[in-house]
Amino acid sequence: MSFRSAGFRPAVLGSAVALVFALSATALMAQDAQPKTSAPAAASTAAKPAAAASTAAAPAAASAPAATATVKPGDATAGQAKAAVCGACHGLDGNSSDPQYPKLAGQSEQYIVHQLTSFKAGTRQNPIMLGMATPLSEQDMHDIGAYFSSKTPLPGVADQALVAHGEELFRQGDPKRDIPACMACHSIDGRGNPGAMYPELTSQHAQYIQATLKAWHDGVTWGKDAHSQIMPSIAQKLSTDDIAALASYVEGLHSADNQPPAASP
């Protein structure tokens, strides 16, 4: 019994050793093969950041603002249709019949654009004009300005009792009170000067001029920039009589360009 037992033990051990070597060899072969099969997976993993970067770039490209459309000089023909709604208060040709609403006929395109922009931004406050200006594009504003600029303001009539004082202030100012002459910015005949800040005043309704000067006198401003402070600083030096005289004089002021043609004999 003891002999068989001793003889059996080496056989078992030999088989076990052989099995261990076989398993070890298999494991080594599997390890040698693993890098070859995992290489594509690594390449796939490496490709993911690039794909992620591409995906991240897509929203950025989508959210990039579109190029701003170039604004062209105003087109009076296009402006006529766009200005139709303005006619309810300002008249279809810019000559308002209600003196609380300013005449726009003959006003410069640049000035009209500037005021519409101010209404839209809220720097010049007026609930009605805010609603009118809000949907307008910059091109719309230029077209509307060009249309009204092409029209001729109808002449007004000044109060003869106020003309002398109004003319003096308009042409000479009052150096003693540090009041400059109006014509320095608005020209001697009231047609204004180039640019957006010096409007035409000829034939403007006296009631509108008076109300505007009084508002400036009382501290109302149409913006925070330096130009917007000029008229309030001047109006605060004017008396009630000064304002009435200037407003009446301006209404009766007619530039030669705005005179109606003489009747044929």
PLM region descriptions:
Residues 2-15:
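Bacterial N-terminal signal peptides that target proteins for export
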Residues 25-27:
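N-terminal signal peptide c-region/cleavage motif recognized by signal peptidases
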Residues 36-83, 97-98, 150-176, 262-265:
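Electrostatic cytochrome c docking/interface patches
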Residues 64-122:
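The feature marks the first
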Residues 79, 86-93, 144, 179-189, ...:
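The canonical Cys-X-X-Cys-His
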Residues 80-84, 109, 173-183, 203-212, ...:
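Sequence context surrounding c-type heme c attachment/ligation sites in exported
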Residues 97-103, 119-161, 194-200, 217-244, ...:
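Axial heme c-ligation environment in periplasmic c-type cytochrome domains
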